[in-house]
Amino acid sequence: MPKKTILFITLILLALTVLSCKKEVLPKPSSHLRLDYPEANYVQFESQCPFTFEMNADAIIKGEKECGFTISYPKMKATIYLTYKPVNGDINKLLRDAQKLTYEHVIKADDILEQPFLNPQQKVFGMFYQVDGNAATNSQFYATDSTKHFVTGSVYFYAKPNFDSIMPAASYIKNDMQRLLETLKWK
C-alpha cells in the first residue's frame, strides 16, 4: 500500500475519532407548562340588582346596564359575562334561549356535560354546562326562580380556543362560576 493511501486513511480515522468524541446527543425531554393560580378567596358582591353572589376577590367586576356584569380575569385573559333578565311570563323562551346558546357550541365541542342545580331554600334552580373541546366557551350556566328572575353566565377567553392550552385557567374559572351559582341569592 502506498504511503499516501496509508496517510490518507490514518487522517480520516483520526478525524472520525476526534469528531466522535462529542458529548452524546440526547433528545430534549418534553416539558409541560406549569400554571399556578392563587387559591381563590371569595367575597360577597352586592349591588342595586335583585340578586347577590360570591365572586373571586382577584377578579374585576364591571357593571353593565340592566344588571348585566362582566367579571374579568386579566392574568388569564378571560371574562365571565353575566346577564340578568326579569321573568315576565316568558320563562320557557328564556330557558330555550339559554339552552340554545350552549348548544350552538356543539360543532366544536367534544362533549357537553349538564349538571342540574337545585337550591330550594334560596329558590335558585338552574343548569351548569361544562363544554369540553375547542369551543368558544368552556362553562355556562343559567339560574332562575322561575317566576321573577333569570340569570345567565358564560366565560370567554381572549385567545384562540385550544382546550389543552387554556384548560388550567378554564378549570380555575369553572370553579369560580360554580361558586357564583351556589351562592346566588335573590333579593
What are these regions (language model features)?
Residues 1-9:
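Bacterial N-terminal signal peptides that target proteins for export
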Residues 46-100:
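Secretory pathway targeting signatures of secreted, lumenal, and periplasmic proteins
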Residues 154-187:
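Surface-exposed amphipathic alpha-helical segments
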